[in-house]
Amino acid sequence: MPKFAANLTMLWNEIDFLDRFEKAASAGFTGVEYLFPYAYPKEQLAEKLATHKLVQALHNLPAGDWAAGERGIACIPGREGEFQDSVGKGIAYAKALGTQAINCLAGLTPKDAPAEKVHETLIANLKFAAAELKKAGIPFVVEAINTRDIPGFHLHNTRQTLAVLDEVGAEDIFFQYDIYHMQIMEGDLTPTIRANIARIK
């Protein structure tokens, strides 16, 4: 059976973020997700989850300067150290919140770097993250995003994303298959899901 978590980034935007946990519980949800927890102390978020008997289903690794338009840094050469630090921060929050999975946003394809270098950087960063998350016992997922909503997003379809995960070679890295994004990019959802269900979270 499907399990649904309320996305607190998208829902109830008319009220303060910290008040959305109560809204989710009142609406019958038992799990929540949101883009990033890092603007709030871990302890404060953990208290909200416990008070309203909610599970933290997912959050993303830090994704660079979101307000400035960045959408992840995993594919950006020269920022490997920052990415590694972001993995540590993501794990610290996930442990405090009991997060069931961490997602990595690859980022926008940099226009000033050779394609081969961009690819090498992404693979190396995902290998690092997969190893660290495995040690922490936290499931790891990678998401493809449609390029209509986010032009230039590096991972944007099923075949490309699964090929990247194959190259990373970790047994416990999965594809966060977002039906909304993949319908825009490629359609044919049911056969794609059936063919790849073992690799989808």
Which residues does each PLM region occupy?
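N-terminal pre-domain/capping segments
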Residues: M1-K95, T99, L162, D166, ...
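Active-site-proximal loop/turn and secondary-structure-junction residues that shape catalytic pockets
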Residues: M10-W12, Y38, P62-A63, A106-P110, ...
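Hydrophobic residues within beta-strands of alpha/beta enzymes
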Residues: V32-E33, I102, F140, K201
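Hydrophobic residues in well-ordered beta-strands that form the structural core
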Residues: Q56-L58, V142, Y177
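Active-site acidic/histidine proton-transfer and metal-coordination neighborhood
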Residues: I73-F174, I184
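His/Asp/Glu-enriched short active-site or ligand-binding loop at hydrolase and phosphoryl-transfer sites
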Residues: F174, I200-K201
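Histidine/acidic-residue-rich catalytic or RNA/ligand-binding cores of hydrolases
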Residues: M185-R194
